[in-house]
Design a protein with these regions (language model features):
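N-proximal short alpha-helices
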Residues: 2-6, 29, 37, 133-140
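Active-site core of metal-dependent hydrolases
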Residues: 6-121
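Glycine-rich, acidic/polar active-site loops that bind/position phosphate-bearing ligands
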Residues: 126-177
């Protein structure tokens, strides 16, 4: 029989999983992004995306979703599949750093699914690496912020992240006086 300590956090891509699945260089760069807000290089994002995908698939996930909290008061998700058709009729499992970092929740670029042109899309999701990804119902849930293309917050997380950054900046300013 499994105990709580055996399965607690088992479906979370947390620091333990990152250390185990990422190279030391990639892990260090990701930690710098998380801890200091440094920009994430696309090669690091690709390595993290590959590790996340492999880990998620090993836990039974077949899809990923950018998970966010719009101002409606409930969570929202846009699901995509890891599965991509291959030229020989089979499938390959793919997930890129670009897909990890930024998503498009309103489907404006879908061939038949969008209600508006892509340039009219109301916003996009952006990965928040300070929150751990997790698996729910066989989907890798990637915590994201939801912003308009003009930079306006369209969710509850963006103001929190911005206030944390402002508080950090002012604390450093006061401490270095």
């Amino acid at each position: 029989m499994k105990t709580v300590t055996d399965y607690f956090g088992d479906l979370v891509f947390d620091d333990r999983v990152m250390k185990a699945t990422l190279s030391a260089k990639v892990y260090s760069s990701l930690r710098k992004t998380i801890d200091e807000g440094c920009e994430l290089d696309i090669s690091v994002a690709n390595a993290v995306a590959t590790a996340m995908k492999d880990w998620a698939i090993s836990k039974g996930a077949t899809h990923f979703t950018h998970w966010f909290q719009p101002l409606t008061g409930i969570t929202a998700e846009k699901h995509d599949s890891f599965i991509t058709p291959s030229p020989d009729g089979g499938v390959i499992m793919e997930f890129s750093g670009k897909e990890l970092i930024k998503g498009e929740p309103d489907a404006s670029s879908f061939p038949n699914g969008g209600l508006r042109a892509t340039f009219e899309a109301r916003g996009y999701t952006a990965w928040d690496p300070t929150s751990y990804a997790f698996i729910k119902d066989n989907s890798l849930c990637i915590p994201t912020a939801f912003c308009s293309y003009g930079g306006y917050a369209l969710d509850k997380k963006t103001p929190l992240l911005r206030s944390m950054e402002a508080l950090h900046r002012q604390t450093i300013r006061i401490l270095l006086r």
